[in-house]
């Protein structure tokens, strides 16, 4: 049968797949594919009424509030549950629509099949192996990455906050961009946002640069041929990185508090106590210093490996040309190390930007700042969001801040990666 005859014969069958998914495939003896498409449609139709009801709930967020009559509580609509269920229903509809389109395309491209059912299973497994393997990861990504992001975005357009809009006691309403306007228009909120943003940038930049620099110094020192006990020193320097960060931060908090061992020692030698964690400037310097202590060993190992990849011929040639040690470092060592670790620096900056543990476990965002709204002097965005949600239930503003952080970090990371020579070299390979 030639192609023209096949098209003429298959043309009347195509409309079947517009009404019954898999109809064309089943009529052409593709029992496996046709059965899968048909089963998906049956499942979707069985739950269609529930899906429609859930989608309506996404737009209304509920109409009946909880009612209390004495000791009796009559439950109403839970707006947040309805929002989450509505998002899930929307994703299901989107996946079904995608499957429906794939069904139509497959129906147009399929000819008559002469394989047995077992052979069809084997062929489907061979042809769609990558799709089958990636499907669980794809669904997991939707559930654990896409779904939370979408919900966060939607919450930012609601009034989900204490004390008057916390389900199930109260309903939540859509408010548009009111929360975004409030964050930047109201002085108490805008001052807090700008203050926390400034400190977050200072913290992320200083923590990244100082950690990298200190690790670089350690790696260069241990790379010297005349240094004694290099292996022992390397082991000692690695210990802060080997100890769990959670434990290290709590130990430093214990050591540096007002009545901790460090201040007790200072008092014993006749010196005054130092408010490491209770004075704003001291607290900021302390959290950066502790971050350097924890992170420098990692960069030491990373840079030590990068140094071994630099050819000694470059240094020998530069010595012949009369280059000094500083010129060798400036023109050879530093550029070649940065070329290898630049992507890691960007990721470290993004990590420090959201480094919840380093701030919260040491200072809990303190000391308190009376000029800020629900934030302290050392709070960064992520710890401020934590307080807004867990302590004060201001979910609407927390969602707005989360969106801003997500957009900023995404843009910065993409821009930096695309500008890096290492990224361009990889793309050109």
What are these regions (language model features)?
Residues 2-13, 19-27, 31-34, 38-46, ...:
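N-terminal signal-anchor/first transmembrane alpha helix
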Residues 64-91, 185-198, 280, 391-392:
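Membrane-interface segments at the starts/ends of alpha-helical transmembrane spans
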Residues 49-58, 133-429:
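A structural signal for multi-pass alpha-helical bundles of membrane permease subunits
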Residues 41, 51, 56-64, 75-82:
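N-terminal, membrane-interfacial amphipathic/helix-forming hydrophobic leader that caps
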